[in-house]
Amino acid sequence: MSIIKPAIIIGNGPSRNIIDLEKLVGKAPLYGCNALYRDFNRWDYLVAIDSGMINELHKDRVDNGDLIIPPEEERWESIKYNSNGRRRTNAGMVAADYAIRHKNNLIYLLGFDFILDGEDSVDNVYKDSKNYGPETHALEEDNYNRMKYFEWFVHEHIGVSFIFVVPDHKIEHCKSVRAGNVRAMTTSEFLKKLEK
């Protein structure tokens, strides 16, 4: 039996707003995405893949914790997934990849709202702020490709468990992921687990 090594990836979907991120500190390594530093500075790793955000981080001299700015090659879907017409990935997927590289085998996904139905699935807590203009807004139809890539990614990491943390009232509105190593958990259940 292997030792469970959890990590928490903090995405930028609005569902993460119901969690006091301070309560996560010290429970597991925290991997944040892009502009998280604007609201919360106790992350262990912060991942940025877009030029505007990378410039903002450098300009603001963000250096608490480890800043992960992957090489350009890692800012796109894996060539193993799609060698032709690779799509840009997102900081959350890159953060999950780095968490696995750091030997974590239980990945909690907060604010990964593409798992939800409807408009909530494409909203962002930083929408319409600096570096989050209309050109960055996701569309619901983008979720099909996001989900397909996520399913491929988790199949590539079959020894890792992935848990989407979603608001209690949205648990019935999660999309189905075709992978045995993925499930959803309510925010209440997640917070109780942290208290143990």
Feature map (PLM): residue ranges:
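Metal-ion/cofactor- or nucleotide/acyl-coenzyme-handling active-site neighborhoods
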Residues: 1-196
